[in-house]
């Protein structure tokens, strides 16, 4: 195949390629990048200004300046500009009714049966979370085995497994019966083990007395109760109740504005992490990460184990906010754990911090989860509060990859209804979002060929209202496409089961397992047939095919391709 000229507004074209019009393909490189308008016909896309007829334009990274390669097809090229968003258009007009924001469900007594895991998966669960603060390895092993059994039955459905470490939590001890704390009452915490009296309970942290000071505010169970420290001895912290409530066993304790001087990864956490390595979980959610050193320590350990597990940091302490940039850079993704975050910091800061964490993660292509109290009332009630519905919508609008259910599915009375509510609210909110891309030109393509192609593929898919199909061995192009938030689904075909599992967390990505063929056309045809058989594509619909990277499906050298095809049933 010969090169016909550099990509520019004055690109030259071999006249022999003008005769065929089977497929549409274009390399969206520096052609002023203004997408003004498109009139879609069965064999071509009409854009303004200069005309180019090709089946596909492939960019080779072998030379410094991109070269255009053309074969078979028709395409009219106009001025292409990434700033031409259809801001006035909402996604309601799209034929794609699949939810793009992912749902993380915590598995517990209410949801650990085979039947319930199946039902949660069918209702919309994308990630099964194992909370290592509760249960033992035997119970979590059952959950892992059930999720893997479910995954083995499908090539187009993937439930990822997330192991959430307990972390260095300070908790109250066990109490035989709940203790009701009343405002103004004196109440004590002791570092002596096994104490459970009407006015004193033990804590699990020997340095608790040293960490707190007179005047500190203690928050119990994420702020459900609060106490002021009045005095302390060598083994006792004496408090007065400010906000009362029912104190149950093993409630979490925070000191407002302070983090406990505990290691971020405890001995128990290391045991749980090894358990995750043995079971090949997909994600670790690491609790109370204070700095990037913790992330590097865990990643180094995983490297020695040859374990391909992504590290999600939980941002939930005052220290994590101080070190946020370095922590986000070091991790593979983040969770906005609003419960403890709102306990250690003023609650009015939490919405702003949520927005900031989402923005930082999205700017460097890392997934972000919004968690805690999303549908808290549905633990005991069949319908959510209106504020909870708005909370879900805000997380979706801010661009979170996933939203999480904790007690709602772990021990709540209505786990399936909670998932259904989250699914419905997220889907409706997504339909109202403007059709656009969110990146600036400088981040779109400067110095990164893959980002450039993902950026322009998203623009093309938005303009044509077409789904994207990406073929990936590493998941990287699917992640880049997710970053630019195209309005339609990203069907990510991969021949790696681990990559399929990992992509389950990313916004807008539907991972599908499929063996790749040496024949690119065979791989294309099988992918389209699979989607047609599952009624995910319709007759006459256009799809945007994307391939980019060092391991393309049709040849060994690094190649990039964007191609548009029209679906013909049986053709």
Swiss-Prot record:
Could you say which residues are annotated as the site Transition state stabilizer? 314
Gene Ontology cellular component list? chloroplast; chloroplast stroma
What residues bind K(+), as annotated?
A: 131, 133, 164-165
For this entry, list what GO says about its biological process: seed maturation
Residues engaged in binding Mg(2+): 316, 340
Documented EC number(s): 2.7.1.40
Q: Where is the transit peptide?
A: 1-55
User: What is this protein called in UniProt?
Assistant: Plastidial pyruvate kinase 3, chloroplastic
Tell where it localizes: Plastid, Chloroplast stroma
Q: Which keywords describe this protein according to UniProt? A: ATP-binding, Chloroplast, Glycolysis, Kinase, Magnesium, Metal-binding, Nucleotide-binding, Plastid, Potassium, Pyruvate, Transferase, Transit peptide
């Amino acid at each position: 195949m010969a090169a016909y000229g550099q990509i520019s507004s004055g690109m030259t074209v071999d006249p022999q390629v003008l005769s065929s019009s089977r497929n549409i393909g274009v390399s969206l490189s520096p052609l002023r990048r203004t997408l003004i308008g498109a009139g879609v016909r069965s064999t071509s896309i009409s854009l303004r200004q200069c005309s180019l007829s090709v089946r596909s334009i492939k960019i080779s990274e072998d030379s410094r300046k991109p070269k255009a390669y053309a074969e078979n097809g028709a395409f009219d090229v106009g001025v292409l500009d990434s700033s031409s968003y259809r801001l006035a258009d909402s996604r309601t007009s799209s034929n794609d009714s699949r939810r793009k924001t992912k749902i993380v469900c915590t598995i517990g007594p209410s949801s650990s049966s085979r039947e319930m895991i199946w039902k949660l998966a069918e209702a919309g669960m994308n990630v099964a979370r194992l909370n290592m603060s509760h249960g033992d390895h035997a119970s979590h092993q059952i959950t892992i085995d059930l999720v893997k059994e479910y995954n083995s039955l499908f090539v187009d459905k993937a439930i990822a497994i997330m192991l959430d470490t307990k972390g260095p939590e300070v908790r109250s001890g066990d109490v035989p019966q709940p203790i009701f704390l009343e405002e103004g009452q004196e109440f004590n915490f002791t570092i002596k083990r096994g104490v459970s009296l009407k006015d004193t309970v033990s804590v699990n942290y020997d340095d608790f007395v040293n960490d707190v000071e007179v005047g500190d505010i203690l928050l119990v169970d994420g702020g459900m109760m609060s106490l002021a420290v009045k005095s302390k001895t060598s083994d006792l912290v004496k408090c007065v109740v400010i906000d009362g409530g029912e104190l149950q066993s093993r409630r979490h304790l925070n000191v407002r504005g302070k983090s406990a001087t505990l290691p971020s990864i405890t001995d128990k956490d290391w045991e749980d992490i090894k358990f995750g390595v043995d079971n090949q979980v997909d994600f670790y959610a690491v609790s109370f990460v204070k700095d990037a050193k913790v992330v590097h320590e865990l990643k180094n350990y995983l490297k020695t184990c040859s374990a391909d597990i992504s590290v999600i940091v939980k941002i939930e302490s005052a220290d994590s906010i101080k070190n946020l940039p370095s922590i986000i850079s070091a991790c593979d993704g983040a969770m906005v754990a609003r419960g403890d975050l709102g306990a250690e910091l003023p609650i009015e800061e939490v919405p702003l911090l949520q927005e900031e964490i989402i923005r930082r993660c999205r700017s460097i292509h890392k997934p972000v989860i919004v968690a805690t109290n999303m549908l808290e009332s549905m633990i005991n009630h069949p319908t959510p509060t209106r504020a909870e519905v708005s909370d879900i919508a805000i997380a979706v609008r801010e661009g979170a990859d996933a939203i999480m259910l904790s007690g709602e599915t772990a021990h709540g009375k209505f786990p399936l209804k909670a998932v259904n509510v989250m699914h419905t609210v997220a889907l409706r909110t997504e339909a109202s979002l403007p059709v656009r891309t969110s990146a600036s030109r400088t981040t779109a393509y400067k110095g990164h060929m893959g980002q450039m192609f993902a950026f322009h593929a998203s623009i093309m898919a938005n303009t044509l209202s077409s789904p994207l199909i990406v073929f990936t061995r590493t998941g990287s192009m699917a992640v880049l496409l997710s970053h630019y938030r195209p309005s339609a689904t990203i069907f990510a075909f991969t021949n790696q089961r681990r990559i399929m599992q990992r992509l389950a967390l990313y916004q807008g990505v539907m991972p599908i397992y499929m063996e790749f063929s040496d024949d690119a056309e065979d791989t294309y045809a099988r992918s389209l047939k699979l989607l047609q058989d599952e009624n995910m594509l319709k007759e006459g619909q256009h799809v945007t095919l994307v391939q980019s990277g060092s391991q393309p499906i049709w040849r060994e050298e690094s190649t990039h391709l964007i191609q548009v095809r029209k679906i013909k049933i049986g053709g």
